[in-house]
UniProtKB/Swiss-Prot annotation:
The protein's name in its UniProt record: Short-type peptidyl-prolyl cis-trans isomerase
Residue ranges of domain PPIase FKBP-type in the record: 1-95
GO BP term (any one): protein refolding
Protein family: Belongs to the FKBP-type PPIase family.
EC number in record: 5.2.1.8
Region ranges (IF): 86-137
GO CC annotations, alphabetized: cytosol
Principal EC category: isomerase
UniProt xrefs under Pfam families: FKBP_C (PF00254)
Protein purpose: Catalyzes the cis-trans isomerization of peptidyl prolyl bonds and accelerates protein folding. Also exhibits chaperone-like activity.
Keywords from the named record: Chaperone, Cytoplasm, Isomerase, Rotamase
Amino acid sequence: MINLIKKGDYVKVDYILEVDGKVIDTSIEEVAKENKIYYPEREYEPIGFIVGNGELIEGFEEAVIGMEVGEEKTVTIPPEKGYGLRDERLIQEIPKEMFADADFEPQEGMLILASGIPAKIIKVTDDTVTLDFNHELAGKELKFTIKVRDVQPAESE
């Protein structure tokens, strides 16, 4: 009997993520090396999650529903079902003097934690630093190639 993935199932999948035609993340070591995004300290293995629990972005979880073990497909996920649209309210200009006690000099492109929240410095002037608190993939269309490796059906009630 073929088990098609449904909400509540525990699945393991391999994936390749492309943004703007460039591979930026994968669970497959060989693909990471080919695309020069390999990190030796990372474990490259299928990711496991319960479908519908909100552990991953909505579009990814929806994409695996109806798939079966061994199946591979490529899906394009719009920002609304990915990391959301960019929100201009999440861009904030703060006085540069707030960095006076920091152990670094703020520079454009730098990623920092501001009150525990990740932000990217997008502009530095003599008096101000502009921070962008949007997720780096906000507003981006995500192209995922997904291959199902394992499915554990949800426990029937």
